[in-house]
Amino acid sequence: MVMSAAMEAVRARIRDVPDFPQKGIVFKDITPVLADPTTFREVIDAFVARWKDERISKVVGIESRGFLFAAPLAYALGAGLTIARKPGKLPWETIREVYSLEYGENSLELHIDAVKAGERVLVVDDVLATGGTADAVGRLVTRQGATLVAYSFLVELGFLGGAKRLGREHVHALLSY
């Protein structure tokens, strides 16, 4: 795949942090992308270019870095925005979806009225790793009767198999490692 000069500039700003959050992990730090206004704009513009013709009516941002991309994308698309959060963080009645971790379980919630039947929904997060969190949010969306259009990420860590779990045809990432 040929990468645009803009995405090459974005890739150059993502730094590797070895042994974070634990030994043996190389963390992809996106904060330099966010700190540079030109690079951040390139990212949002690339997301908008990909989704502008898909009639997205709602964008769901996944806690917490997904919020950073979902909000400006929803605004640019003229779509609504909602957020998927960890349990106990949303103030209204919620629906919950549990997903498995390597050692245990976690869950995410949406407000019960955040996504409605018939809406066309895009789920957004910063990084796709194993796909567990995104898959849980996708299940929340479809349980409400909405159409899950796709998942969109800044970065995909392809070696962790998240795209396969979500269904490769439903996954979009600006950058892959």
From Swiss-Prot:
It is found in: Cytoplasm. Pathway: Purine metabolism; AMP biosynthesis via salvage pathway; AMP from adenine: step 1/1. One of its GO terms (biological process) is purine ribonucleoside salvage. It catalyses: AMP + diphosphate = 5-phospho-alpha-D-ribose 1-diphosphate + adenine. Its EC number is 2.4.2.7. It holds the Pfam family Pribosyltran. GO terms for cellular component: cytoplasm. It comes from the Bacteria. Keywords: Cytoplasm, Glycosyltransferase, Purine salvage, Transferase. GO terms for molecular function: adenine binding; adenine phosphoribosyltransferase activity; AMP binding. Its main location: cytoplasm. SUPFAM superfamilies: PRTase-like (SSF53271). Homodimer. Belongs to the purine/pyrimidine phosphoribosyltransferase family. Catalyzes a salvage reaction resulting in the formation of AMP, that is energically less costly than de novo synthesis. This is Adenine phosphoribosyltransferase.
